[in-house]
Structures are given as C-alpha cells and as structure tokens.
Amino acid sequence: MSTIYDHAGSLRRMGNDPELFHEMVELLRTDAPTLLSAVQSADREGDPPRLQRAAHTLKGLSANFGAERAVAAAGEVERLAKARQSGGLPAAITELEESLDELIAALAPSPQMSGSS
C-alpha cells in the first residue's frame, strides 16, 4: 500500500520550511472544498473549461504534497473535461472527492503536534 502523501518530499519541495508546510496544509484545507464545489457545479452545469481549471488547480495543490492518488484523480477529471468526455466524470469526481478527503485527513495534526495536554 502506498502512502497518502510524501511528508519528506513535501518538505523538500517547500525548502525544508515547516512553517511553509503548515501554511500549505491550511491552504489545501480551505481551498480544496471550494475547488471541489467548483468541479461539481461545473459538471452539473456542463462547463468543461471551468471543470478543467478547478481540477487542474486541485492537481497542483495535491502535487505539493506528493499525494499520488489525489493527483491522479484530479488529472483524470481534468483529462475528461478537456476531452469533453462526460461519461466517466461521475466516477472520476467521486474518486477525486475520496482522495482529497483522505489527504486532508492524513494532514490533520496529531495530538502531539497540536500541543494539547
């Protein structure tokens, strides 16, 4: 089983700056739900360019963490939107939702990190 994200690789990509890492985690936590909502509404409204842009942004956010499953899922949504192949979108969007939920949960601070007693 592969890991959900690559912590060491993420830190390297962020200049070994733990503060930047935590800022990027917060960015993902705040932006991913908004972008996922944009993916869902663009799909419902039949707006492939908007769907493609939102999926592309989610792919980039996920790539910051080396989250292969989320990157692949966002890439598939982006590819389907670009090709205007709506038939595979429901399953691809579900996979994207699940992989982002998994990533965000994996990035949640542990009790030791949060400073709780």
Tell where the protein language model's regions lie, with residue ranges.
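Two-component system phosphorelay core
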Residues: 1-117
